[in-house]
Amino acid sequence: MVITSMAFEKLDFKRSNEIEMMKRSKSFHESIIKRRTVRDFSDEKVPIEIIFNAIKSASSAPSGANKQPWHFAIVSDPQVKHKIRKAAEKEEKEFYDNRAPDDWLKDLDQFGTDSRKPFLEVAPYLIVVFKKNYDLEGDKREKNYYVNESVGIASGFLLAALHDSGLATLTHTPSPMGFLEKILDRPKNERAVLLIPVGYPAKDAKVPKLNKKSFESICSTF
């Protein structure tokens, strides 16, 4: 091992037998494939501790040089959610009317989406994921590494943790997202990358029937 100033500790790892490993891998697969993008939420309250636990799980994700270049903002205040909805719908209307290329709109048409985003107010929580290209230590900038990759992995952890907790989510990416930094008064080194409504699905919630690519088409062995 290379000599380093960092302290190390023994890995906390308990090896399971292959039968148990197969059961666990199958159980996770059967659970995660039931996760769906939901646009119709119930306004029923959710204990915030569940949201905290999911974000704690997300923050355990690996990151470049362990810089942890992320920040998670939880929004439940109705007035703040209203501001976010209005700003998001303004950007989305511009997107649908003027910015989106025709092929993108054609691909979106089958889902029946438009610039209206009521879920941003109905869902009890919004989680905004911010990336930090650099950290600020006073006036000094400290560079972060593999920021997009690190935040992407953490976001995946977050979605899986929320689903495992029994909650529905939507990955919403209005573009541009600068309004989130302004509304939530985030520092200049943070950029919003993901807006996630979280809650229980509405009782009459429906999702599109989707076909996923075959395993053979998305995986190769060598």
Q: Where on the chain are the PLM-derived regions?
A:
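N-terminal accessory segments that position/regulate proteins before the catalytic core
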Residues: 1-38, 42-48, 52, 94
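C-terminal helix-cap and adjacent tail motif
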Residues: 2-20, 24, 114, 191-222
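Glycine/small-residue-rich phosphate/adenosyl-binding loop
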Residues: 2, 74-151
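Glycine-rich, charged/polar anion/phosphate-binding loops
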Residues: 57-59, 110-115, 180-182, 205
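Glycine-rich phosphate/pyrophosphate-binding beta-alpha loops
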Residues: 59-65
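Small-aliphatic-rich amphipathic alpha-helix that forms the alpha element of a beta-alpha
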Residues: 54-59, 133-183
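Short loop-to-beta-strand entry elements in the cores of soluble alpha/beta enzymes
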Residues: 65-76
